[in-house]
C-alpha cells in the first residue's frame, strides 16, 4: 500500500483512512438506525461517527491532489451521486418515508471547485472557469426559489445550498487542498 505524501494522520495510507472512516460511519449509523428509538443513550456512537466525514473529505482532497485525470475522478463522483440518489428514491418509496443519506455532493462540489480554481490559477480560460464556478451557485439559488429541493431534479443537479454538512464543509475541503503544511490543515480542521 502506497503511503500518501505529507499525510497529517500518522502516515496512514489513503485506504486505511477510508477504512477508519467506514468503521466510524458504521458505528454512527448503528446508533442512528438501531438505538435511536430506544431508551439506550449511547451518544458516543454519534460522536465517533463524526470522525468519518473529515476523513472522507481528506481522502477526496488527496485524490484530487495526486490524480492524473481530475475530470475523470469528478465524473466518477457524479456517477456515484446519481446511483445513491436512485437508491434513496427507491428506499423512500418502499419504506414510505423520506430517506436522505447522500453526502457525495459535498465531495463532488469540493472536487469541482478545486479543479476550477486550479484552472484559474494556471490561467487557462479564466473567464470560462469563473462562469463555471457560478453555475452551481445560480442553480442552487434557482432550485431554492422554485422549490425543487428533494425532487428528481436534484438527482442530476445537486443543490450546493442543501448539502448535508453545509457549504462551510466545502470551504474546509478547498482550504485543506491549498494548505500544504500539516499545521495549517490541523488549524483549519479545528476552526471549521
Indicate where each model-derived feature is located.
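Alpha-helical transmembrane segments and their immediate juxtamembrane cytosolic regions
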Residues: 1-192
Amino acid at each position: 500500500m502506497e503511503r500518501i505524501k505529507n499525510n497529517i494522520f500518522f502516515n496512514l495510507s489513503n485506504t486505511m483512512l477510508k477504512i477508519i472512516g467506514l468503521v466510524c460511519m458504521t458505528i454512527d449509523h448503528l446508533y442512528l438506525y438501531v438505538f435511536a428509538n430506544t431508551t439506550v443513550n449511547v451518544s458516543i456512537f454519534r460522536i465517533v461517527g463524526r470522525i468519518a466525514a473529515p476523513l472522507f473529505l481528506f481522502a477526496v482532497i488527496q485524490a484530487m491532489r495526486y490524480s492524473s485525470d481530475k475530470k475523470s475522478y469528478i465524473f466518477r463522483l457524479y456517477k456515484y451521486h446519481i446511483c445513491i440518489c436512485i437508491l434513496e428514491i427507491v428506499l423512500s418509496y418502499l419504506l414510505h418515508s423520506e430517506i436522505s443519506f447522500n453526502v457525495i455532493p459535498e465531495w463532488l462540489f469540493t472536487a469541482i471547485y478545486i479543479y476550477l480554481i486550479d484552472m484559474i490559477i494556471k490561467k487557462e480560460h479564466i473567464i470560462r472557469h469563473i462562469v463555471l464556478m457560478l453555475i452551481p451557485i445560480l442553480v442552487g439559488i434557482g432550485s431554492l426559489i422554485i422549490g425543487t429541493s428533494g425532487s428528481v431534479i436534484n438527482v442530476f443537479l445537486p443543490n450546493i445550498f442543501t448539502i448535508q454538512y453545509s457549504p462551510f464543509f466545502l470551504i474546509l475541503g478547498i482550504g485543506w487542498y491549498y494548505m500544504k503544511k500539516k499545521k495549517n490543515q490541523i488549524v483549519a480542521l479545528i476552526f471549521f
